[in-house]
């Protein structure tokens, strides 16, 4: 069995790959981080035959992009100190572009990639362009920011962020997106976690449906900077009391369709209760 959680990955200056099809069950997604510790530090990269999404976790930078037909500069982007300080700034990059990141302070950036034939231009998704949703109810209520969704004509990638208040659940009721049906499409997923304060933790259970040919049921200890690979199965998350939990989520598959998932039938009844609970708690 291949590894599904990656922790204590040393962050080097420049790009550090964390998960990819080479070291996991993933078929499409590669995820890593760019770290530039000092102002004026630079990193140069290229997308090749993949599309990419750059997520500024914290710090400020400029990003220069060169395609076959144009040059684009996104100057002084990223305003939050860390992921808990506001909405994200993300940049979508199509295949076959070169890009350069120039730090204007210490900066940390998530890099999500997947094979693509997209002809979309590069796109800057600013904090004010992000779709914000309050999802769930009671102790499974959380905030979800969708940055790379229908607003961007990517071929495969869907990218956003989720924030769990202390003690709260997310990806709940448990859902999955691992088979083709009228309501579900197969999408693999990667979660990258941050915890506030950083000595805190959360837990994630990943478990398959009864009809899965290779069933598994695992629980992972989520600590700051942990990365979890979700090849299939239900995958709920909970934050420990006293600690905020954040995760970047990255989805990719043959068909790109956000929200095409199915709930665990044992727990799906909770979704029907959410409007009632939210109405009661409003008073």
Regions found by a protein language model. Give the residues of each.
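Glycine- and acidic-residue-biased ligand/ion/polar-headgroup-sensing regions
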Residues: 48-75, 93, 166, 178-224, ...
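N-terminal non-catalytic cap/leader segment that marks the start of a structured domain
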Residues: 2-78, 276, 283
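A short secondary-structure junction signal
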Residues: 120-126, 156-160, 168-177, 202-206, ...
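Conserved metal-binding segment of the jelly-roll/cupin
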Residues: 84-104, 114, 221-242
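Catalytic core of Fe(II)/2-oxoglutarate
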Residues: 215-227, 234-263
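Double-stranded beta-helix
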Residues: 107-148, 205, 243, 248-283
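A short glycine-rich, His/Asp/Glu-containing loop-to-beta-strand
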Residues: 11-44, 51, 140-190
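Short, structured patches in soluble enzyme cores that scaffold and shape functional sites
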Residues: 95, 103-105, 111-115, 148-149, ...
């Amino acid at each position: 069995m291949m590894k599904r959680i990656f922790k204590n990955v040393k962050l080097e200056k420049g790009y550090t790959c964390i998960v990819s099809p080479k070291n996991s069950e993933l078929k499409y997604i590669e995820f890593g981080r760019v770290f530039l510790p000092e102002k004026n530090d630079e990193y140069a990269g290229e997308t090749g035959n993949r599309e990419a999404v750059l997520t500024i976790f914290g710090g400020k930078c400029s990003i220069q992009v060169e395609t076959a037909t144009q040059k684009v500069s996104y100057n002084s982007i990223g305003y939050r100190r860390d992921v808990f300080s506001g909405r994200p700034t993300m940049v979508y990059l199509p295949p076959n572009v070169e890009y350069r990141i120039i730090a204007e302070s210490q900066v940390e950036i998530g890099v999500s990639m997947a094979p693509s034939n997209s002809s979309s231009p590069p796109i800057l998704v600013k904090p004010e362009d992000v779709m914000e949703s309050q999802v769930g109810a009671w102790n499974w209520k959380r905030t979800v920011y969708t940055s790379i969704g229908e607003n961007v004509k990517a071929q495969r990638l869907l990218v956003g962020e989720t924030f769990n208040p202390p003690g709260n659940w997310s990806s709940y009721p448990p859902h999955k997106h691992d088979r083709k049906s009228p309501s579900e499409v197969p999408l693999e997923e990667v979660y990258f976690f941050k915890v506030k304060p950083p000595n805190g933790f959360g837990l994630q259970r990943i478990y398959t449906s009864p009809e899965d040919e290779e069933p598994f049921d695992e629980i992972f200890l989520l600590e700051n900077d942990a990365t979890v690979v979700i090849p299939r199965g239900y995958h709920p998350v909970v934050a420990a009391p006293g600690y905020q939990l954040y995760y970047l989520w990255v989805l990719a598959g043959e068909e790109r369709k956000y929200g095409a998932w199915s709930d665990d039938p044992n727990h799906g009844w909770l979704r029907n209760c959410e409007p009632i609970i939210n109405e009661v708690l409003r008073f």
